Amino acid sequence: MASTFFGLDIAYTGVQAANAKLNTTANNIANVDTKGYTRQEATQVASDALRISQSYGMAGTGVTVTDINQVRNEFYDVKYWQAQTNLGQYDMKMYYMYQIEDYFTDKDTVEGFEPIFSAMFDSLEEVYKQAGTPSTKTQFIGAAGDLCEYFNAQATNLEKLQLGVNEEIKNKVDEINSIAEQIATLNKQINTIEVNHLRANELRDKRNLLIDQLSKIVDVEVRETPIYTTPGGTEKSGIYTYEVSIAGGQILVQGYEYNTLECVARSAEEKVNQSDADGLFEIKWSNTMDFNLYGANLGGELKGLIEVRDGNNEEYFHGTTKSVKPNSDGTYEVTIEVPNKDYLTDMNKCTLPDSGQLTLVNTKYKYSGFEFDGTKIPATYTFKIEREAGQADPTIFDGKEARVGTKVDYQGIPYYQEQMNEWVRIFAKAMNDIEKTAVDEEGKPAEVLFTAKEKVSGDEIKFTADLADNKYKSSDSDYYRLTAGNISVNNEMVKDASKFGTTVDIKKGGDAQDVTELLLTVQDDKNKVNFRGCSAKEFLQCITSDIALSANNAKTFTENYTNINKSVSQTRLSISGVDNDEEALHLVKFQEAYNLSAKVMQIMTEIYDRLILQTGV
């Protein structure tokens, strides 16, 4: 049988439910501008009915508020994270490609390639007109030095930019580690509360906001799995395992545990590309597991930074091991056949450092030099490698894949470094080959006009090696050792311009200019300098077209993903965000419900007053 005060109890549950909804609405309104806040709503259900001794059998007992839940759609969360990942990647590319474009753009305030190159050949034209005049030779040598300084400066700019990107990569790794730690801590706090079958909404908001931040840095996958009270059971314990994966499924956070990444600087012997800056970071898991830095599934700002720093347009050293021979000193000679691709068979395009790491399948061995043999197809490279303690015997990799570095399908800093190196090698060789046919004013054979300076010793490399047989050693004095960063004018000519020869025969007189005439043709003659089908003076057009294309692509994708991001974000906010107008309607609605339940209580009170006070019950 129902209590005498049954109706009053029912009205009280209505007041409680309306009050809970009013408080939830008030909380939503208070957090309308809180970043990451998810709109909440109180869930109410009818209370369990009560059996009574009446013909209708059971009577309702009012209402119960079961939960205060977040209004959230996981589908749009995933879409938002994907949009953030893509936006982060192209935003980084656009930012740095505009910087590279700025380096190569001729400005009114700073002379670029075209005016410097033109000035050099203008001064050479003056030598042609007045071959016996010392001042014209001095002016030409100075103009040639200006061209060298231009490339030196560009190489330095790209190296500094590469180091800047490298530092930004470290910052992003630190951010990932910090976010991982915070998520693991929040997982524990959330489970501590929710094991009592409560809902830690605010803590969940903090965690979701961290995932939002992480998704822009790197691609992210989230999985939340309930834990049941018994294995194979159906009753949930209230605890969940929250797992976060990045970079194509690599575990970052698993429940209360998290993994961290660390940046390990490459040593000078571990360079991947010849012109790479020293100390570029490899990223590894702190538990010694490899982090798949170049995986196709990597995304976000980290991917954009990696592609800018390491992008080689897929032009990297790779081939198949032909033979592995042990030496008496404990080293090994590994001969590798390479595909018939010009960036592997033309030493002007090759980017191998003198020493570095050769990867046989998945094992890295240090090499201290290499030899190239291009006399037959396929061309071969022979490396001298060292086997460290614990490493596999290299002979087991006979016939297996070999590589230095890895392919990165983007025209990043290494690509533009290689393009400059290739041009200065072709151009310097063309000029030097002509100049070496001349004699100076004393009748002595002229030396090369352009040289390379050793980075450490500062010694000049004058390219004395003979590559007529298309063979090369990394220790040879050849144009492969010439880069945009070390090209210079022969110091002997800088000191004494008379060392610059203008004729093949001094007997022709001081005004003889047959060599000068040939040198002048280098700027236009594609038979002497052919850079990607262009003449020497068209170098900048080739480079800037690449940069402009990459920069415009990055800009277009950034704009597209910005629009997608905004669209998904708006849809997401329409579901989980707080709308002032909607909450204002809820206030009126729940106030009315509260008033009605209160009115019921008032009426029931009057009934009980009459029943108790006036009937003498």
Predicted regions and their residues:
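Structural signature of extracellular appendage/secretion-system components
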Residues: 1-617
